[in-house]
Structure formats: structure tokens, C-alpha cells
């Protein structure tokens, strides 16, 4: 009886062990299948990351190249002489520096000319009445009438002056033919006659 029980226990152990082996084998098999799938997934993920990293590197290279091109364009850009605010800050070419120096020199010259002109105009305007401020209409009318009279007198005096000069020239040319003597004496007499006749003509007017 005891032997039969021992044999049954051994058989049960053996069968149990065999069941565990089968299950363990199945489990191991399943693990192997899962590991293959995981490896495939990992490989695909590595390829994906590699592709993404390569794309990122390409984008970075493109960005670096565009930035370098932009900086080179700015450095080689010519500076305009019209407006310094529109010029690039990083302009370092020799032509640009020469243009900047030239524009600065021209600006200094123009400022100097403007200051000299203002000073000259200021000196010319000393003692000059630029505007007449009238108290009322009667005062303004009187001032305009006086100004008109002064202009008429000045115009008449200029006309008389030109007439006197013209007549003096004609008389001196006529008297030159009638004067005798040497060249120097004749020139002296012409000067005296022309001066005297010119003054007489002005007084007679």
C-alpha cells in the first residue's frame, strides 16, 4: 500500500513537472516571439529616430547656410549717402567706409555754409525795417503814401543821373576834338572838362 502511494506521488510529480516544462516551454516560446516583435519594433523606432535626426541636421545646415549668406550680404552691402539710418550696422567694406566719410564731410560743409549764410544775412538785416506795424488805417495809409513818394523821387533821380552821364559823354567826345597840345595835356583837359561839365549838368537838373 505504501509502495503504491509512493509510486503515485512520483507519477504525479513527474506529470506535474512535465506540465510545468510544457508551460515553461510555451512561455519561453511566447517570450521569443515577443522578443522578435520587440526587436522589430525597436529597429523601426531606431530607423525613425535616425531619419528624424538626419532631417533635423539637414534643417540646421540649411539654417546655418542661410544665416551665413545673410551676414555676408549685409557685410558686402553698399552704404547709401542719403540716409544713414537706412544703412546696415555691420557694414565693414572699405567702399562703405569711404562713402560714409564722404557723406559726413559733405554734411559738415553744408552746415558750415548754412551757418555762414545765416550770419551774412543777419549782418545785412541790421538796421533794416522788415515790417511796418500800423496802429490804425489812417497811419497805414500815411505810411504807404510816404513810401510811394520816396519811390517816385528815387526813380526820377536815377533817370536824371543816367541822362547827365549820357550828355557828359557826348560833350567830352566833342571837346576832345577841339583841344590842342600834347597827349598828356589833352587827356588832363578832357578830364577837367568832363568833370566840370558833369557836375554842372547834375546841378542844372
Swiss-Prot record:
Residues 1-63, 79-118 are annotated as: Disordered. Residues 22-32, 103-112 have a biased composition (Basic and acidic residues). InterPro entries: Rrp15. Residues 33-63 have a biased composition (Acidic residues). GO terms for biological process: maturation of 5.8S rRNA; maturation of LSU-rRNA. The keyword Glycoprotein does not apply. One of its GO terms (cellular component) is nucleolus. The keyword rRNA processing applies. It is found in: Nucleus, Nucleolus. Belongs to the RRP15 family. Constituent of pre-60S ribosomal particles. Required for large subunit rRNA maturation. This is Ribosomal RNA-processing protein 15.
Amino acid at each position: 500500500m505504501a509502495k503504491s502511494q509512493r509510486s503515485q506521488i512520483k507519477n504525479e510529480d513527474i506529470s506535474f513537472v512535465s506540465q510545468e516544462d510544457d508551460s515553461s516551454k510555451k512561455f519561453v516560446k511566447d517570450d521569443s516571439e515577443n522578443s522578435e516583435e520587440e526587436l522589430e519594433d525597436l529597429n523601426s523606432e531606431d530607423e525613425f529616430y535616425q531619419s528624424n535626426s538626419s532631417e533635423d541636421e539637414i534643417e540646421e545646415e540649411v539654417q546655418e547656410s542661410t544665416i551665413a549668406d545673410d551676414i555676408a550680404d549685409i557685410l558686402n552691402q553698399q552704404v547709401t549717402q542719403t540716409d544713414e539710418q537706412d544703412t546696415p550696422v555691420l557694414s565693414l567694406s572699405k567702399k562703405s567706409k569711404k562713402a560714409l566719410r564722404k557723406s559726413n564731410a559733405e554734411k559738415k560743409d553744408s552746415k558750415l555754409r548754412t551757418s555762414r549764410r545765416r550770419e551774412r544775412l543777419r549782418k545785412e538785416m541790421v538796421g533794416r525795417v522788415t515790417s511796418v506795424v500800423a496802429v490804425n488805417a489812417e497811419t497805414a495809409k500815411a505810411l504807404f503814401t510816404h513810401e510811394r513818394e520816396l519811390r517816385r523821387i528815387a526813380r526820377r533821380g536815377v533817370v536824371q543821373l543816367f541822362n547827365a552821364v549820357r550828355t557828359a559823354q557826348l560833350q567830352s567826345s566833342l571837346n576832345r576834338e577841339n583841344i590842342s597840345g600834347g597827349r598828356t595835356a589833352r587827356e588832363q583837359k578832357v578830364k577837367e572838362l568832363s568833370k566840370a561839365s558833369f557836375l554842372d549838368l547834375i546841378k542844372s537838373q
